[in-house]
Amino acid sequence: SFQGKKLYAGLVDAYMRKLLVEGFTLEFFIEGGRSRTGKLLTPKFGLLSMLVDAALLLRNRKVRFVPISIGYERIIEQKAYVEELSGGDKQKENIGGLLRTPAILRSRYGRLYVQFGEIIDLEQEKAGVLGSALEDAGAAALSPKQRRALVQRIGHRVVYEISQATIATPASIVAMALLDHSRRGLSHQSLHETCKILLAALQRFGARIAAVALDEQGELRDDALREAIALFLDGKLITKHETEEDPIYEPVSDRRLALEYYKNTIIHFFVPSAMVFSALALQPSRSATRAALRAQVER
């Protein structure tokens, strides 16, 4: 945090201006830290505000923001996250300590996914704030209110593009299927069918699906499902009950928060439909025109 540290803030500001002038790429984390729930955090504007201020003073140099989504099939810190969400103290992050734990080195963590969202152009966003494209307009063309609006516009746009670029993995789909049903456990066949339904919905919503999850026809691969199940079994997030017909998978009761993390990485894709269904449920006749639903959703 830069609060109360004017010298530190000034040095960082000057350093970023120097890097921009010389054409270097800058990396920063718009959320300000790691999400403990799997849901995207609201944008933090401190560094972004400094970067925008510096960029507005440049001439003859295009500045663009590249949203990047980094997703994990299984996270190393899941135990610490669950403890924090359950009311425990936040532990200082120390990757060295994690890697020295024997269980960490023996466990499987699956794949890591890096995806890029739509590139955001500073000049275009500035034109959106001003209402028209102004050539060679620097910081002087923006009032303090407009500058704040520009920073917030870019920050929220970056987070949105990251959310749209997030990969739906077999693990996230399996977690959602296991948590969002009325029974305690699901047979392998029922789990497969539920995951197929969720996959079809995600495809309709335009979500990016992990290539490993799909066969040549775009259908859910059973071995991808089994691999996700194996990751959760290895992490002791679910239990497997053998039966004569089909194994049954059940979330471990005190590890549900960990499963929620993986479910939450894709839950935002379902929000628009959920809002429409909620608006429809509020209609007395359970039917409404498109205009009435839009008005209800936008309230």
Q: What name fits each language-model region?
A:
Residues S1-R299:
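Membrane-interfacial terminal anchoring regions of lipid-handling membrane enzymes
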